[in-house]
């Protein structure tokens, strides 16, 4: 089995694959101080609950946007699974797609991995991948899978946190889809929720429209990321929602590498 690990700024996702089949997935808060031993205690318990044994894992692949978290995850792979982890974007792992931007070395591993996964599900078409996480990214992927650039915007939670941090009398609230379509709130909390949620929807609508106009070709819009389901009721925004896009991209990246050996 393959253990795929995707470390984001907020959460780290772990998944088991057999071939192309996603068997199980788990999530833990990102903490670059967490040791290999701590990871294993947590992961071993969850694997056992779902009927898997760590001895069945024969490969590990990691994508991370938190460089300081990498060492302990590599140690996890070596110490507890007896393998050297492959790291997305580092030798001997090659992307297998072109990064057609001015600074290809600056493209986040998660965005390149998402491009690989999007190409697997929508080959031969122009794609717009929107990843809702700590930051929200919108990326144009060409018909051949090439990464062609994109946008980075503050994530919806980050926007809410900035509002609360800057305005002393505003309460801390959880982001969720408003209970109604009304955009006139009658409490402070509802007004905040309306402003952040519907303001964010308007931003995404506007950015999609601008990207479509500039690209000038039909686009398949794919949503992913930990907060993508927050906007699932806004069906007009996306053609498909793929919560596991990055994990599946790691699986495809590993499998295409194996074919070259």
From Swiss-Prot:
Pathway: Cofactor biosynthesis; coenzyme A biosynthesis; CoA from (R)-pantothenate: step 1/5
Pfam family, any one: Pan_kinase
Molecular function GO labels: ATP binding; pantothenate kinase activity
Gene Ontology annotations of biological process type: coenzyme A biosynthetic process
Residues reported in the UniProt entry to bind substrate: 108-111, 188
Subunit structure: Homodimer.
Family statement drawn from the similarity comment of this UniProt entry: Belongs to the type III pantothenate kinase family.
Protein name as catalogued: Type III pantothenate kinase
Phylogenetic placement of the source organism: Bacteria, Pseudomonadati, Pseudomonadota, Alphaproteobacteria, Sphingomonadales
